[in-house]
Amino acid sequence: MRNYKDFISIVFDNKQVHIPSEDKKNITESYDFLKSFAKNKIIYGVNTGFGSMAQYRIAEEDQLQLQYNLIRSHSAGSGDYFDEETVRAAILCRLNSLSLGKSGVHIEAIQLMCDLLNHQITPLIFKHGGVGASGDLVQLAHLALVLIGEGEVFYQGKRRPTADVFAQVGLKPLQIHLREGLSLMNGTSVMTGLAGVNLHYAHKLLLWTVKFSTAINELVQSYDDHFSAELNNAKQHNGQKEIANLMRTFLADSKRTRKRADHLYTGEHQETVFKEKVQEYYSLRCVPQILGAVYDTIAHTQRIVEEELNSANDNPIIDVSTQQVYHGGNFHGDYISLEMDKLKIVITRITMLAERQLNYLLNPKINELLPPFVNAGKLGFNFGMQGVQFTATSTTAENQTLSNPMYVHSIPNNNDNQDIVSMGTNAATLTHKVINNAFEVLAIEAITIAQAIDILGCYDELSATTRAWYDLLRQQVPFLKDDKVMYPYLEKAKTMLRAAQVQF
């Protein structure tokens, strides 16, 4: 597994996982070399203690028990636990990193992780506990705990003791051979796995935002020059060009967008004050510029996540080619932490854009087209989308607060051995929350746009792209004339948005 598409197919589509023969060779050579090399040398985590206790030599007869002690003592997570897709992603990332043959781990550990994925056995891993350097020690300890046959897992929808599930499916717990405890725990695999999951949903959010933005431009019969190739190619940013091109593609068959030359360049206007807007509001007109920055950020973040996913994030690093063991800090999560902070900022930007577009639709003083709150009932007696706007505004505000960076919130710990840490897992977890919030706001926007389409009676004039998602939404959420309890519809719309397939 070397690219993001493979990651998605395994994590979300339950594609079976196997260790390639070349990887098996590298894994075995690395293990055999380290086992021989470490016999008369001081190797961190093999014959020493860990962290600030590394100055203590561990007797040969205690070295295997040391690994069990590490796993059990660091299985100390708390709070909520990660969902199945995040844990699968974390297992896959750890498996992939250790398969590079740079960790001196026994192949049994890697094969057992493959078995967890293939049997859809999900270890119980808690959200709280990771500081992002020495990797995701606490969270990955819970993975290692399951691999040695202890702890708890989710299997077939139930939370159960690992030992019971292993017995049921015929798996044997991992036996420690050399340094499997440290190698399983000492890396960035939870934050990287969650980062990959976050990216999966970030792509969906971006595509939906482009679709909703184009739909609103249709509703208000915008001029098409603000997403034209000529205007957007005048700037050098790839993302802006891609978003503008996507808007043109989506709107190619729309009967509602207009050419400025047909209306404002005719020389027929003699008014001093124009009743019609000469230019659309920024939330409609500046979509390529706003979402272009989001597009480029997501693309860059995906590259960094792919690189980390295919990196040996362990310590020490075993190099068979030079016959050496190198001690350093490849477990440090700075790359992922920084990228997750950037990703949550641009997802919050998506949320802010959606909230402003929603406000535009709900306020007749600025859209000059729709009834207040897109109310299809009796004004004053019915409320339309008034109630859900509060939810959208509140959720957007929460995202704005959550977008403060984790990357700069290092707190020294481990007797100051870890005197600067990445907080990468916290960053990825907060980003996950921001993404979930964004889906809630976009669900409200989607329902509101659909209401506006029905009120205007313009369905037949819309682009095929807008009609397609409108039809999909209407299978879940009806046209609302009378006041209804809204929260079930919001959840249905959110589920629809999250389940959509993404193709850029």
Where are the predicted features?
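Glycine-rich, flexible loop motifs
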Residues: 1-40, 65-126, 217, 230-233
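Mid-sequence acidic-hydrophobic segments that form the walls
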Residues: 73, 93-97, 112-123, 128, ...
